[in-house]
């Protein structure tokens, strides 16, 4: 966990300069489920992130998702390295851990930017797609291909970059920036914009039933929308 913390916090993921209090509230929890061989593990990763709501102490969830199928090689005290131009590195199975972490960092950044400005997260969703396109390949490595299942990293990045799902970005901006951020100043107007954001997502669901993004979004919103 210490190596993951250092990897996530000491690497520069974006070009914008932010104050310490403007950092995204997020957590990554890696749970080792099985040892497959010498220094090779199967694990699950829980990813959580939230966005502060303007003029309140409330943080609205961006994502709360568990990735159940991560296989990687790791030796204690080994530094975690990632090169977006060479995602597979010298050892694809070892590189799979940093590829997964970098992927979700970019997904979180994209969601956060989209929640503040329309389509502002595109650059990060494209970075996530680049990781998918160049993802490590190896025995038991999964989650990067369309045939690995219908609920995986491939499909989440695909949804966020596919123009068929363009209303996702309108929904995120409307829900958070126009809805949640105005809720405490004008509850009626804020609630209306939140509903407008959900209506965008309803259109996405109608046009693309059971998409990966919709599952991820509403899984994170289960308590907020009750």
Map each language-model feature to its residues.
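Hydrophilic extracytoplasmic domains
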Residues: 217-226
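Solvent-exposed, acidic/flexible segments
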Residues: 38, 94-98, 102, 187, ...
């Amino acid at each position: 966990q210490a190596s993951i913390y250092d990897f996530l916090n000491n690497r520069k993921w974006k070009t914008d300069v932010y104050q310490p209090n403007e950092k995204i509230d997020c957590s990554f929890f890696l749970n080792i489920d099985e040892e497959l061989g010498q220094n090779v593990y199967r694990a699950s990763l829980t990813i959580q992130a939230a966005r502060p709501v303007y003029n309140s102490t409330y943080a609205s969830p961006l994502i709360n998702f568990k990735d159940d199928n991560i296989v990687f090689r790791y030796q204690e005290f080994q530094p975690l390295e990632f090169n977006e131009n060479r995602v597979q590195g010298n050892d694809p199975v070892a590189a799979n851990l940093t590829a997964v972490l970098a992927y979700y960092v970019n997904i979180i950044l994209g969601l956060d930017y989209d929640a503040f400005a329309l389509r502002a997260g595109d650059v990060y969703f494209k970075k996530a797609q680049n990781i998918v396109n160049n993802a490590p390949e190896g025995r038991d490595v999964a989650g990067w291909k369309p045939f690995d299942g219908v609920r995986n990293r491939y499909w989440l990045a695909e949804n966020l970059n596919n123009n068929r799902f363009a209303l996702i970005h309108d929904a995120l901006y409307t829900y958070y920036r126009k809805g949640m951020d105005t809720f405490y100043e004008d509850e009626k107007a804020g609630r209306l914009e939140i509903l407008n954001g959900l209506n965008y997502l309803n259109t996405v669901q109608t046009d693309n039933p059971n998409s990966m993004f919709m599952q991820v979004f509403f899984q994170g919103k289960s308590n907020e929308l009750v």
